[in-house]
């Protein structure tokens, strides 16, 4: 049952952070950033927030990471307003490489299909 609550809190934080990034954060470095997943620690003290950026450029990814780190305080404050939790978890932003990995596998499968 506790695991179900952790998953629900993670989904709610994902939804709220996406909304906050679109509506409240005015930093141009975080434009085009989408939250793909949130993994919560068991005690809900921290949340690892995975994100993707529309651009494939390494400089844009680095700028997005810096922009998210800079906006962490604003995001936590807005989460505190919108969520009914005793303590808002610390947010740790990490780039989600699963989409790029999936695209690479797709390209390899297409290349194999063309050869046969």
UniProtKB/Swiss-Prot annotation:
GO terms for molecular function: ribosomal small subunit binding. GO terms for cellular component: cytosol. InterPro entries: KH_dom-like_a/b, RbfA, RbfA_dom_sf, Ribosome-bd_factorA_CS. Its main location: cytoplasm. It comes from the Bacteria. GO terms for biological process: maturation of SSU-rRNA. It is found in: Cytoplasm. Keywords: Cytoplasm, Ribosome biogenesis. The keyword Chaperone does not apply. Belongs to the RbfA family. Monomer. Binds 30S ribosomal subunits, but not 50S ribosomal subunits or 70S ribosomes. One of several proteins that assist in the late maturation steps of the functional core of the 30S ribosomal subunit. Associates with free 30S ribosomal subunits (but not with 30S subunits that are part of 70S ribosomes or polysomes). Required for efficient processing of 16S rRNA. May interact with the 5'-terminal helix region of 16S rRNA. This is Ribosome-binding factor A. It comes from Streptococcus uberis (strain ATCC BAA-854 / 0140J). The lineage of its organism: Bacteria, Bacillati, Bacillota, Bacilli, Lactobacillales.
